[in-house]
UniProtKB/Swiss-Prot annotation:
S-S pairs: none
NCBIfam families on file: membrane protein insertion efficiency factor YidD
Record-linked Pfam families: YidD
Listed InterPro entries: Membr_insert_effic_factor_YidD
One GO location term (cellular component): plasma membrane
Family of the protein in this entry: Belongs to the UPF0161 family.
Taxonomic classification: Bacteria, Bacillati, Actinomycetota, Actinomycetes, Micrococcales
HAMAP family: UPF0161_YidD
Name this protein carries in UniProt: Putative membrane protein insertion efficiency factor
SMART domains listed in its UniProt record: Haemolytic
């Protein structure tokens, strides 16, 4: 779906994304790094942050080990411990 967007719609809009990498590249990297569900979630959150009043700038995909939340085998999202007792 991302590749279709990049092939069909992206040439009409040009390079207008306020962030680097672009929203479609960010979503593709997020899906490759975190899988379809969490990577897709990160991509949607990024698209919601990308608007005309956003400051923009460099916004890399978070690394796999740096998440504050994790998904259980049953699909529930739970907070990870931050090493505090």
């Amino acid at each position: 779906m991302l590749r279709g967007y990049r092939a069909v719609f992206s040439p009409f809009y040009g390079d207008v994304c306020r962030y680097y990498p672009s929203c479609s590249a960010y979503t593709l990297q997020a899906v490759q790094e975190h899988g379809v569900i969490f990577g897709g979630y990160l991509g949607v959150c990024r698209i919601l942050r990308c608007h005309p009043w956003a400051a923009g700038g460099v916004d890399d995909v978070p690394l796999r080990g740096k998440r504050r939340y994790r998904m259980t085998a049953f699909g529930f999202v739970v907070a990870t411990s931050q090493g505090k007792a």
